[in-house]
Amino acid sequence: MHSSVPAEIRSGQHQGHTAGLAPGCLQVNLVVLPASHAQAFGEYCALNPRPCPLILLTTPGQTDWTELGTGLDVRRDVPAYNIYENGVLSRTVPDLLNDWSDDLVTFALGFSFTFEHALLRAGIPVRNIATNTTVPMYQTNRETRSAGPFAGPLVVSMRPIPAAKVAKAHDISAQFPWARGAPIHSGDPKVLGIEDLDQPDWGDTSETRDGGVPVFWACGVTPQAALEEAELSLCITHRPGHMLVTDLPEHDPFRAGNLQ
């Protein structure tokens, strides 16, 4: 399996979000931070596997990531990167060529885009793909488990699902523990401390019309919130919705011949 998406991103042919691209290929979130904080962040991922399912990490300074894809370069193959300084988003850039240093470690985390394709195959509509928008994301009233300087609230993504298909969506997504797994909650958003679904903290609004039930999954923005709390001098992530598309099969990236 080989995806042409990274090459298209690198050449500037594709600059938007990656929802619905390269069906069958695993999409991952990126977190890039100084090596001095890598162990603590790895522990944070282990303590919070739903929002931070760790797929793989690099050695310090490593830019080529052949384990994830042929010719893949972590500095250039994501449509947009967010750069944080002292916990504050300072800028968004199309590549990291001017911001890279040899002490940086990159983490790849699984993401819920992976199971969206499975939902579609099962006849369950995915609104953000149908409307070509970024899935809405919300900060909740639940806290993650801390490790070192890393702590913060759980962030969730929301997809409206027809009421008759909510249970099926739950069962399908539960088959992908490396990509958020089963939903955190379905139904009343106030249970999660979300007052207004029309005011997402990240992404685009998605109406819960036509009998749609709001279904919430743990989201890859959770570690971004933890990074902001940590106030590191420098850390880098993907821009929400703008993922790294790998060559790994999304249905089982850990099978023999892929990751061990």
UniProtKB/Swiss-Prot annotation:
Annotated InterPro entries: D-Glu_cyclase (IPR009906), Putative_hydro-lyase (IPR038021), UPF0317 (IPR016938)
Ranges in a coiled coil: none
Enzyme class: lyase
Signal peptide: none
GO BP terms: glutamate metabolic process
Any single Pfam family the record assigns to this protein: D-Glu_cyclase
GO MF, one example: D-glutamate cyclase activity
Source organism, top-level taxon: Bacteria
Keywords from the named record: Lyase
EC numbers: 4.2.1.-
Family assignment from sequence similarity: Belongs to the D-glutamate cyclase family.
Protein name: Putative hydro-lyase Dshi_0610
Origin species: Dinoroseobacter shibae (strain DSM 16493 / NCIMB 14021 / DFL 12)
